[in-house]
Amino acid sequence: MKKDSFRIAIVSGKLGDVDGVSLEADKWIDILSSQGHEIFTISGFYRQPVSGVPEEQQILLKSISFDSAEQKYFETLVFPYLSKRPPHFTEPRMAEIQAELEMAGAEVGNHLYEIVQDNRIDVIIAENTNAMPMSLLGGIAVYRIATKHRVATIFHHHDFWWERSRFSENYIEKLLNLIMPPSDLGTEHVVISSYASHILKSIKRVNPRVVPNCENFDNPAVPDDWNADFRTELGFAEDDLLIVQPTRIVPRKRIEDSVRLLGRFMEAYPELADRIRFIISLYQGDEMDENYINDIKGLARRLGVPLYLIAERVASRRDKDTEGRKLYTTRDVLIHADLATYLPVWEGFGNAFLEAVSCKVPIVTTTYLVYKTDIQGVGFKGPEIRDRYDKDGRLEIPDSVLVKMHRILTDRPYRDKIVEHNFKVGRKEFGFDTLRKGISGLIEDYSDEIRASRRRLSKSLTSYFV
């Protein structure tokens, strides 16, 4: 290895999946590897193997999984909104539960530190472990090795627990304030938007570095032998208008607004209605809500919007399922899309937006907060819907948006002009050059602490005999 290269471990509750954290971790691994660093992964669950990391360096630590028995046990006790019938505890009992939680986290921390020692890890990059309590034991474990053992730690925050109603009401706020995220000297913090940077500075008094979500515009998705049959494989005709929602099915994505948008469009342009196919490409994710899925299905049925849930055929990398059927990536799906919808009420950044841009797909989006602070101003073109909601909580959709959608779907030169412009803007502002600069600057600025951590770890491995 080069003199200034490091052994880096990516730590996450889950990797190899299609959620935003997993996808960004994949990109960081790609960049870090290309810069000469040796990469390890430590995860509670691998949906698929992580590309670019040797199998023997993909370490499974089940206790930090989002679905571990310990996580399910503790989260139902400390987050009342996660239960239909939340338990009630006396203060002494709650103190016992927190002590039990911290003890379990400490045990996981000891195991994690052993992994760091055994593999001589110089620095860990903690992917959202100390921002969102999807893995309470993982968050405690990372906090302990960063503060007790002083292992060089970069906290990569994608979103925060206080932004989620299901976590904002809790019985362990003091603990969460301490570890999610911590503000200890010697650690480094990275956020994905200027808005998150402002909030973290205000709340935690730390000065995070902003490295936005980026997309690989240098290697854009193109039609090839693997994805050429996507339409026929999934039962779509060549002249069907595929409207793709390239997100997981969770309430903050406001998929009901996308359904209403298409219902309005089909009513306004009945000559195109029979060709509309609304596709949701990803699964529920880690914010399970069966009622929400049923609500979406029911709304689509009432409005006559043909709805297709194809998550079982979409994965983070190309493969085949147990029945021998092709698994397509989100990019494979998007290059067959005629239009994408992306109408969230809240997003940490906007992976789906950038994926659509990189695949040269026009996209209808809301002007959600981070879009306004970090994306809107760089010059993308396309239909935008202001984030205004009526008294019933429905997105207010102006007729002008329907007109723009119609032109995109019926005027090919106009569509091509938009997507080519957006591709150039995306490549300049959110391409891998931006990511390379952000990551290399981060590692360079933190390198003294990483080297000090390497020396401390080396000393910890020394045996002394008396």
How would you name each of these model-derived features?
Residues M1-K62, K148-V151, L457, L461-V466:
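N-terminal subdomain of nucleotide-sugar transferases
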Residues K2-D4, I31, E38-V123, G298, ...:
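A conserved catalytic-core segment of Leloir-type glycosyltransferases
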Residues I10, F236-K253, V259-R264, F278-I279:
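Conserved donor-binding/catalytic core segment of Leloir-type glycosyltransferases
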Residues N170-A221, D225:
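A short, active-site helix/loop in glycosyltransferases that binds the activated sugar's phosphate group
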Residues L282-Q284, E290-V333, G379-K381, R386:
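Nucleotide-activated donor-binding/catalytic signature segment of Leloir-type glycosyltransferases, i.e.
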Residues V345:
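Aromatic "clamp/platform" in nucleotide-sugar-dependent glycosyltransferases that forms part
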Residues P362-T366, Y371-Q376, G382-P383:
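Short hydrophobic beta-strand element within catalytic cores of glycosyltransferases
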Residues E396, S400-V403, L409-I443:
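A charged, aromatic-enriched C-terminal amphipathic alpha-helix characteristic of glycosyltransferases
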